[in-house]
Structure formats: structure tokens, C-alpha cells
């Protein structure tokens, strides 16, 4: 890949969270940037407001002329784009410089010291925490994130990397084996629960990909993994450490105390204890995320005091246990959880902060294949809520699979307080229920209901005051 003669960058799927981060990087580095997406969203509107040309019809007639000049345009696409996409096929068949998002991310980060955050769950929160710590420490830091951070209201940070100074924090995404394009100096693996079995032929192939990711570690690099993550440490790693609650962990999480909606804990290592580590978000999964970010920043050279202060000031990520509405009578939490393990962690975190409260969950399953592959696990996780409104499966890139429906999933859930709802009936059904906490969860288009549900909460109890 050579950017010497590139003046314009065109992104097919520009509204995706990872793609939009690349779009913003190129725009802030003075490239002409534009792209296509299937539907308008808050994110695409933000990109347009930042000066990028975005359209929503798959047609070369819609592509501005500047992005059709073969010698000066770079075309980037996401693997979520269907194979019959007209624009993608035009650029491919006519020999344009065409790359996947992951290839471009690998290219942009290869000459810089990189922290790669991998794992089925928690990548975005951990990456955002690590980036915030590095940024607050004064160390030059760039970050390509899979969510909008509350601290910076963006999914990208751009640092001054003159003479290769500082660090890049990048999400190492296992989907489509994208993380094999990265060569991290510090490789973090938070967890390794099987997912994306529509991409991987079987569970073992999924696990094997993480070993392949670690082989990409730069010579002398460091591996940080949760203690129960079973991987092969490459011989060229200079150090491999584990973290977790277990006595076997090199860095052991201790003294976990839930208070005021957040968590305080300590980390023990050999004869050293780091006390009073505080995050302003609930859940043991976030304690794990924070510990991974803590260790990544520690090995990158940030002081312990600076790490602790930054974790305390970390404001979270949009759609990751995000409080949409909160007062003394009613709380509304929105979350991106779309895997059974994530749903379980979300519901346990809600129980941790709001013990004894009645919880209603609105869940939109994401992908027919994921619903099929984890049907029993979804049923077990969703049984943790008091009442369930289950939406129809969001197909994303997939066609329906016979016998895989929300009704089939509903029948497996060991609960009587449950119902399948359409998008049209969701608000009406929710309005009928009494609850103390309402949760929306999913990775599809459930986020379009956030504001209507917030309005319902306000109509019931007035403006939020917490």
C-alpha cells in the first residue's frame, strides 16, 4: 500500500464504527474523504458535518468525480458489504487500489508502537480505557476505537508521533480474522468465547486464530491475557503475564467493592498491592476490562498514579452500560450486548447496582447464525431478567435460516414473563409494564428506539435527575 499519490479516500460502509474512525483519520490528515452507507445515521450525519460526502444509494452515478480518479483514490471496504454491491464490484473490476478496513488499519499502525486489544467481549471499553490513560498521561497516543467515547465524543484519537514517539491503541477484531493484519508490541486478550461461527468453520478454528494473532506480535513484545485464556505464547515474546481473580493469576484482582454505581478494587502482584483502583461503571466484566487497560498502560510506561487517576475519570463508551435516563424511581440503561456472555454480564451488573429492583429487558438478537449457534446460551442469559420483550432477529448481512426465529428462542427461556414484540408494537407493550430498570440490548438497529423509550420514561416520571 502506497499513499504517496493518494488525494482522496472513498469508504464503502463509511457509517460503520470502525470505518468511520478511518474516515476521520484520513480527513484530519487532509485527505478528501467520502463514502457510501446503506442508511443515514447519527454517525453518518456527523461525518457529513465534518465535511465528508456521504450518499445512501448503491450507484456509481452517486459517487463524486474526485473518487473515480483511479490514480489518486484509495477505496476501503468493510467485509460486511455484500458480494453483489455495485460500487464495490466497479472498483474491483476496474483495478482501483482497493483494501479491507483491517488492511488499512494494519498499514497505518505498522511503523508505530501498538497496543492491540483482542477478545470476544470488552474490546471497545478496554481500548477506550487504555487510550484515555495514555492520553491523560501526556504520552503521544492515537486510537482507533469501536465506539464513541464519552470523554472525547469520538471514536478516534490522533497523537503527534514525530520520530515514532508514543503509542497507537487499536481494537484487534477477530471478525473475518481482521486482527491478523496487526503487529502489536503489547497484545492483550481479555477473553476467548466462540463467536462468528458463520466465518470460522468450527470452534477450534476460532481458537486457532488467536494463536495466529499472537504470532504477529513484534519481536520482544508483551502478551497480557486473562488467566483462563488458553493460548500459545510465541517464543519471540519477551514477557507473558496473566490477570484475574484466580490465585494463579500473575496480577490478581482483590477487594472488589461496589459503591455509588461504580467499583473499587485492588491488584496484587508478588509482594506489591495497588489499592483503591476505581472505575465509575459497574460489573466484574468492567473490572476485568480496567485491569487489562491498567496493565497495558503500565507496560507502556505510564505511572501507576496516572493510571489510577485516569481510570477514575474515564466516562465510559456510548452503548456500553450507558445511562439514558436515571432518577430515584426509574433507570434506563442501553448496551451493545449481543452475545450470551455479554448479556449475562450486563444483567449481573444491573443486579449488582440495583439489587431487588424489577428489571425489564428489551433484546434484539443479532444475526440468524449467531442466534442458531448460541440458542441455549441466549435462553439461559435472558432468564436473568424479570421480564423480557424479545424483538425479531436483526439479519444484518444474512438471509433467514429455517427454524431460527425469536419465537423459537422465546420458548426455550425458562420464564413466564416474556413476549415477542415487533418494532411497531414495542413501545405499546413496554408502556403496559411496571418496572424499576429498563434495559435495551443488541447490535442491530435497536438504538433507534433509545429516544422514544427515554421519552416514555420522562412521561412516566419527569425529567431525569440522577
Curated annotation (Swiss-Prot):
InterPro entries: Mur-like_cat_sf (IPR036565), Mur_ligase_C (IPR004101), Mur_ligase_C_dom_sf (IPR036615), Mur_ligase_cen (IPR013221), Mur_ligase_N (IPR000713), MurCDEF_pg_biosynth (IPR050061), UDP-N-AcMur_Ala_ligase_MurC (IPR005758). Keywords: ATP-binding, Cell cycle, Cell division, Cell shape, Cell wall biogenesis/degradation, Cytoplasm, Ligase, Nucleotide-binding, Peptidoglycan synthesis. Its EC number is 6.3.2.8. GO terms for molecular function: ATP binding; UDP-N-acetylmuramate-L-alanine ligase activity. Its main location: cytoplasm. It catalyses: UDP-N-acetyl-alpha-D-muramate + L-alanine + ATP = UDP-N-acetyl-alpha-D-muramoyl-L-alanine + ADP + phosphate + H(+). Gene3D superfamilies: Mur ligase, C-terminal domain, Mur-like, catalytic domain, NAD(P)-binding Rossmann-like Domain. This is UDP-N-acetylmuramate--L-alanine ligase.
Amino acid at each position: 500500500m502506497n499513499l504517496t499519490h493518494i488525494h482522496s479516500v472513498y469508504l464503502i460502509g463509511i457509517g460503520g464504527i470502525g470505518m468511520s474512525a478511518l474516515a476521520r483519520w484520513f480527513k484530519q490528515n487532509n485527505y478528501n474523504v467520502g463514502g457510501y452507507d446503506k442508511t443515514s445515521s447519527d454517525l453518518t450525519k456527523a461525518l457529513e458535518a465534518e465535511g465528508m460526502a456521504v450518499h445512501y444509494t448503491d450507484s456509481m452515478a452517486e459517487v463524486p468525480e474526485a473518487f473515480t480518479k483511479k490514480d489518486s483514490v484509495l477505496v476501503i471496504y468493510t467485509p460486511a458489504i455484500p458480494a453483489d454491491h455495485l460500487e464495490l464490484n466497479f472498483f474491483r473490476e476496474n483495478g482501483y487500489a482497493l483494501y479491507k478496513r483491517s488492511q488499512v488499519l494494519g498499514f497505518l499502525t505498522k511503523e508505530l508502537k501498538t497496543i492491540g486489544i483482542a477478545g470476544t467481549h470488552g474490546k471497545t471499553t478496554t481500548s477506550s480505557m487504555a487510550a484515555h490513560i495514555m492520553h491523560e498521561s501526556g504520552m503521544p497516543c492515537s486510537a482507533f476505537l469501536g465506539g464513541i467515547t464519552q470523554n472525547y465524543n469520538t471514536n478516534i484519537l490522533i497523537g503527534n508521533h514525530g520520530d515514532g514517539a508514543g503509542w497507537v491503541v487499536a481494537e484487534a477484531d477477530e471478525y473475518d480474522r481482521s486482527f491478523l493484519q496487526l503487529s502489536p508490541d503489547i497484545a492483550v486478550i481479555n477473553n476467548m468465547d466462540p463467536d462468528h461461527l458463520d466465518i470460522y468453520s468450527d470452534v477450534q478454528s476460532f481458537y486457532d486464530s488467536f494463536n495466529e494473532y499472537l504470532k504477529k506480535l513484534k519481536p520482544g513484545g508483551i502478551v497480557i491475557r486473562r488467566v483462563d485464556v488458553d493460548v500459545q505464547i510465541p517464543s519471540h515474546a519477551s514477557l507473558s503475564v496473566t490477570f484475574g481473580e484466580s490465585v494463579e493469576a500473575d496480577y490478581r484482582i482483590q477487594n472488589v467493592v461496589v459503591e455509588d454505581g461504580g467499583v473499587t478494587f485492588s491488584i496484587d502482584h508478588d509482594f506489591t498491592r495497588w489499592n483503591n483502583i476505581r472505575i465509575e461503571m459497574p460489573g466484574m466484566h468492567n473490572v476485568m476490562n480496567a485491569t487489562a487497560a491498567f496493565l497495558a498502560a503500565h507496560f507502556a510506561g505510564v505511572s501507576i498514579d496516572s493510571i489510577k487517576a485516569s481510570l477514575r475519570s474515564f466516562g465510559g463508551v456510548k452503548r456500553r452500560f450507558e445511562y439514558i435516563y436515571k432518577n430515584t424511581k426509574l433507570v434506563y440503561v442501553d448496551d451493545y450486548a449481543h452475545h450470551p456472555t455479554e448479556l449475562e454480564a450486563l444483567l449481573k451488573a444491573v443486579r449488582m447496582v440495583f439489587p431487588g429492583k424489577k428489571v425489564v429487558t428489551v433484546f434484539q438478537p443479532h444475526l440468524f447464525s449467531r442466534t442458531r449457534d448460541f440458542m441455549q446460551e441466549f435462553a439461559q442469559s435472558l432468564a436473568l431478567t424479570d421480564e423480557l420483550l424479545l424483538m425479531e432477529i436483526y439479519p444484518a448481512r444474512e438471509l433467514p435460516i429455517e427454524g431460527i426465529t425469536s419465537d423459537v428462542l422465546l420458548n426455550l427461556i425458562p420464564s413466564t414473563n416474556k413476549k415477542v414484540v415487533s418494532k411497531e408494537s414495542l413501545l405499546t407493550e413496554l408502556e403496559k409494564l411496571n418496572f424499576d430498570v429498563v434495559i435495551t440490548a443488541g447490535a442491530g438497529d435497536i438504538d433507534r428506539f433509545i429516544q422514544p423509550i427515554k421519552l416514555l420514561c420522562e412521561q412516566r416520571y419527569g425529567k431525569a435527575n440522577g
